[in-house]
């Protein structure tokens, strides 16, 4: 799911458009739902304050995309959390490499 957020951010940077936090949230939620996961949260926030972002963000700005999900159908409740710093190309590449494995 975080790969979907990376894709939205990279597209905004490549075209010079502002990054829409709601578009990133939607991409995260759609990817998580497609994987059959129950979303606890899918958020886009300022990486320093961790305050959720509401308005457009310059395409070259760094923003934090964070998710938490539960895995349904398990005897024990499993909760997974992850995040990626959008705009930090090294962090984006790390995430994409991990997903490709």
What is each residue range found by the language model?
Residues 26-101:
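Phosphate/ribose-recognition catalytic cores of enzymes acting on nucleotide-derived substrates
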